[in-house]
C-alpha cells in the first residue's frame, strides 16, 4: 500500500476545512466523507454576511453580549438574574423606559463606585487625573505581583520545601509556619 503524498493530504485538509466552515449553515459531506470528491463536484461560494455588534455602545450593568457559534445568533445574558434574551437591552430600554427593571441598569453601590470615581476625577485637572490613574494602576500591579509570585519556603515541622505564593504563611501539609527564603529573617527565628 502506497502512502499518500503531501499534495493529496493538503488538498484533503483544505476540502475538509471548507466543509466545516462556521459561515456555511449547510453541513455537507463531500465524496466519501474524508474530503475526497469526484472531479465534477464543486464548492459553492460562501456568502458574505455582516453583523452589527453595536460595540461602540456600552451594555447596561450586568449584561453581556454573546454569540452562539452553532447558530450564529447573538444573545444577551444578564449575569445578575441569569436572564437570557435575544433583544438588545440597549434598544429595549430606549424604546420603553417604563418597562420595569428587567433590563434595568440599576447597579449596586459597589458597581457604581467605579463610575463615581471616574466622574469625580473627570472634574479635576487632566494632569491630576493622570497622576491618580497611574497611582491606582501601580498599586493594583503591586498587589497582583504579590499574589502571583511563587517563592520557595521551608517547613521546620515536617522538613519539606514548597513553592507557595508569596503571601502564604502556613505550611500546606501540616499548617505550621513556613520559613520564606525570599525574606530576611532575624537570627532568633
UniProtKB/Swiss-Prot annotation:
Keywords from the named record: ATP-binding, Helicase, Hydrolase, Nucleotide-binding
Region annotation (Disordered) maps to: 90-148
Q: Which domain of life is it from?
A: Eukaryota
Enumerate the InterPro entries for this protein.
WW_dom_sf, WWC/KIBRA_Hippo_Reg
Phenotype on disruption: Increased cuticle development leading to ectopic cuticle biosynthesis in trichomes.
Instruction: Reply yes or no: does the keyword Nucleotide-binding apply.
Output: yes
Its tissue distribution reads: Mostly observed in roots, flowers and siliques. Expressed in cells differentiated from epidermal cells such as trichomes, stigmatic papillar cells and guard cells, as well as in tissues undergoing abscission and dehiscence.
Q: What's the subunit arrangement here? A: Interacts with BHLH122/CFLAP1 and BHLH80/CFLAP2. Binds to HDG1.
Its annotated function is as follows: Negatively regulates the cuticle development by interacting with the HD-ZIP IV transcription factor HDG1.
Q: What is this protein called?
A: Protein CURLY FLAG LEAF 1
Amino acid at each position: 500500500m502506497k502512502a499518500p503524498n503531501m499534495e493529496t493530504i493538503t488538498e484533503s485538509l483544505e476540502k475538509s476545512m471548507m466543509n466545516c466552515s462556521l459561515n456555511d449553515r449547510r453541513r455537507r459531506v463531500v465524496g466519501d466523507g474524508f474530503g475526497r470528491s469526484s472531479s465534477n463536484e464543486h464548492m459553492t461560494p460562501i456568502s458574505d454576511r455582516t453583523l452589527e455588534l453595536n460595540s461602540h455602545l456600552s451594555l447596561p450593568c450586568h449584561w453581556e453580549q454573546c454569540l452562539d457559534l452553532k447558530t450564529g445568533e447573538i444573545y444577551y445574558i444578564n449575569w445578575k438574574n441569569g436572564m437570557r434574551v435575544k433583544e438588545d437591552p440597549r434598544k429595549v430600554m430606549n424604546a420603553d423606559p417604563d418597562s420595569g427593571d428587567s433590563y434595568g441598569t440599576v447597579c449596586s453601590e459597589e458597581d457604581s463606585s467605579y463610575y463615581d470615581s471616574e466622574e469625580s476625577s473627570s472634574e479635576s485637572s487632566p494632569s491630576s487625573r493622570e497622576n491618580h490613574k497611574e497611582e491606582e494602576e501601580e498599586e493594583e500591579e503591586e498587589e497582583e505581583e504579590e499574589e502571583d509570585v511563587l517563592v520557595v519556603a521551608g517547613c521546620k515541622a515536617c522538613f519539606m520545601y514548597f513553592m507557595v505564593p508569596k503571601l502564604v504563611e502556613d505550611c500546606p501539609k501540616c499548617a505550621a509556619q513556613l520559613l520564606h527564603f525570599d525574606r530576611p529573617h532575624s537570627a532568633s527565628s
